[in-house]
């Protein structure tokens, strides 16, 4: 990329900066949840909604982000995304109650939903096609550093300052990013088709109300009748979307996507798989602090080996899949992640704390292999005219399943424990033990989906398919 103009390189730095902000915020909050609960006078069992409100908002808003960027312009939308994210951070820091914090996190989620996909779109427009891969590698590298720094930085700020600072640090960075966006980023627009507002609203309502219903009376305080009503509304909304999308060329997500078997299996496996793995980043620091008495900073440091294992495995995952095939890799990593989850719980409860970093490193390796395999399996056989829609649907499902996973983790804690889990409670470790056993079972379930992947599904299948389509 050395031959790119200076202006283009600065624009890439702005996109990379946005990726870093968004990825840092996904992990920096996890370590601070017990301290937030104490400060706000809430049970730790309710704090999963701090993550759910952000991730669910991202899932709901993702389908609209690309269309808005094409319609209004990438600079305008990227600037708006940074401003909303920064304002959300400010309101999070000023929150005095859990409900105020949840609303502020939702505002952050609107900005986060637009930041990454619009950033990718910007790179496509400002960089020559032959340099696109190198440019995307450059801008996504800070996004990989964010999860590495997030837990430790969050723990450090909580332990030596207060939890408010995990949001306040976004404000000066966001102001600089917003000014740089206005000054340096071009405002590309393009002709767009009419946005499927009806489909968007149906999906948004369906996802939101079903997630709220899943949280149950323990988390939301809704009565059983209200929860049943939410389930009914959510199911009706999703059924109406399916009817709306039939034979509709302008549908938000075409049902033709599901004619590709690997897409259907990959999407179902990704949804179920990320529900299980989505529990781990939330539960691990909570367990370390509340269940084992670790300090916030110590708990944050313990998360670093998991991120390092994930980053290191990305270098060889392609060779692993090509050697053993998608079905074997996905079934093995799914069952392996379940076993590693049990191993983590066992070593922690036995007091073998020096072993935990190695277990978390192994967990990161297994999880990364499974994520990469799920993503490529889902998208690799889609025809070119459906690839963009399929990628958007996968991105939405990834965020939705993570929010459901965190919700289920909070629900499990509520089922096995009282409303006040604390380090001083004699039954706390028992509560966490039953929760982790349940999580290991849920994590293993997608193996049944991945076992249906054809045994001859290798990466070269996608290559040969494209060659045939080009003839």
Swiss-Prot record:
Periplasmic side: 1-11, 70-76, 125-137, 186-196, 246-262, 307-341, 417-430
Pfam families from the UniProt entry: MFS_1 (PF07690)
Top-level taxonomy: Bacteria, Pseudomonadati, Pseudomonadota, Gammaproteobacteria, Enterobacterales
Membrane topology summary: Multi-pass membrane protein
Gene Ontology MF, one: transmembrane transporter activity
Family to which this protein belongs: Belongs to the major facilitator superfamily. TCR/Tet family.
GO-annotated cellular components: plasma membrane
Family annotation (InterPro entries): EmrB-like (IPR004638), MFS (IPR011701), MFS_dom (IPR020846), MFS_trans_sf (IPR036259), Multi-R_MdtD (IPR023721)
NCBIfam families xref list: efflux_EmrB, PRK10504.1
UniProt entry keywords in alphabetical sequence: Cell inner membrane, Cell membrane, Membrane, Transmembrane, Transmembrane helix, Transport
Organism: Escherichia coli O45:K1 (strain S88 / ExPEC)
Residue intervals on the Cytoplasmic side: 33-48, 98-101, 159-164, 218-224, 284-285, 363-395, 452-471
Compartments, as annotated in UniProt: Cell inner membrane
Membrane-spanning segments: 12-32, 49-69, 77-97, 102-124, 138-158, 165-185, 197-217, 225-245, 263-283, 286-306, 342-362, 396-416, 431-451
Protein name: Putative multidrug resistance protein MdtD
């Amino acid at each position: 990329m050395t031959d790119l103009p200076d202006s283009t390189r600065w624009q890439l730095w702005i996109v990379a900066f946005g990726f870093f902000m968004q990825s840092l915020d996904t992990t920096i909050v996890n370590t601070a949840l017990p301290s937030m609960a104490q400060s706000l006078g809430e049970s730790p069992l309710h704090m999963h909604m701090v993550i759910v409100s952000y991730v669910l908002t991202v899932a709901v808003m993702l389908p609209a982000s690309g269309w808005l960027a094409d319609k209004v312009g990438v600079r305008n939308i990227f600037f708006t995304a940074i401003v909303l994210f920064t304002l959300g951070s400010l309101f999070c820091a000023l929150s005095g109650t859990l409900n105020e914090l949840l609303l502020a996190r939702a505002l952050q989620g609107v900005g986060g939903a637009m930041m990454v996909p619009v950033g990718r779109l910007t790179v496509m427009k400002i960089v020559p096609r032959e340099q696109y891969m190198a440019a995307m590698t450059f801008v996504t590298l800070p996004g990989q550093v964010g999860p590495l720094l997030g837990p430790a930085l969050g723990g450090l700020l909580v332990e030596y300052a207060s939890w408010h600072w995990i949001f306040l640090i976004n404000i000066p960075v966001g102001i600089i990013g917003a000014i740089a966006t206005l000054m340096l980023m071009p405002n590309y627009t393009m002709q767009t088709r009419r946005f499927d507002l009806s489909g968007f609203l149906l999906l948004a309502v369906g996802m939101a109300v079903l997630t709220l219903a899943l949280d149950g009376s323990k988390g939301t305080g809704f009565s059983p009748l209200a929860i049943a009503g939410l389930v009914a509304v959510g199911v009706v909304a999703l059924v109406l979307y399916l009817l709306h999308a039939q034979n509709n060329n302008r549908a938000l997500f075409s049902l033709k996507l599901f004619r590709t078997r690997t897409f259907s299996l990959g999407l179902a496996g990704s949804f179920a798989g990320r529900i299980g793995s989505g529990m781990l980043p939330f539960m691990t620091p909570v367990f370390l602090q509340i269940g084992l008495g670790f300090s916030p900073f110590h708990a944050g440091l313990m998360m670093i080996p998991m991120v390092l294992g994930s980053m290191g495995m990305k270098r060889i995952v392609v060779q692993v899949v090509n050697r053993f095939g998608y079905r074997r890799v996905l079934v093995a990593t799914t069952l392996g992640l379940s076993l590693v989850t049990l191993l983590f719980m066992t070593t922690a409860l036995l007091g073998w704390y020096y072993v935990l970093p190695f277990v978390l490193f192994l967990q990161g390796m297994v999880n990364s292999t499974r994520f990469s395999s799920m993503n490529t399996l889902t998208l690799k056989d889609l025809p070119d005219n459906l690839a963009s829609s399929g990628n958007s649907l996968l991105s939405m499902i990834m965020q939705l399943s993570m929010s459901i996973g965190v919700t289920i983790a909070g629900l499990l804690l509520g089922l096995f424990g009282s409303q006040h889990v604390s380090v001083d409670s004699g039954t706390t470790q028992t509560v966490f033990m039953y929760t982790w056993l349940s999580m290991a079972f849920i994590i293993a379930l997608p193996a049944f989906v991945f076992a249906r992947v054809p045994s001859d599904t290798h990466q070269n299948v996608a290559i040969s398919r494209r060659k045939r389509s080009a003839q």
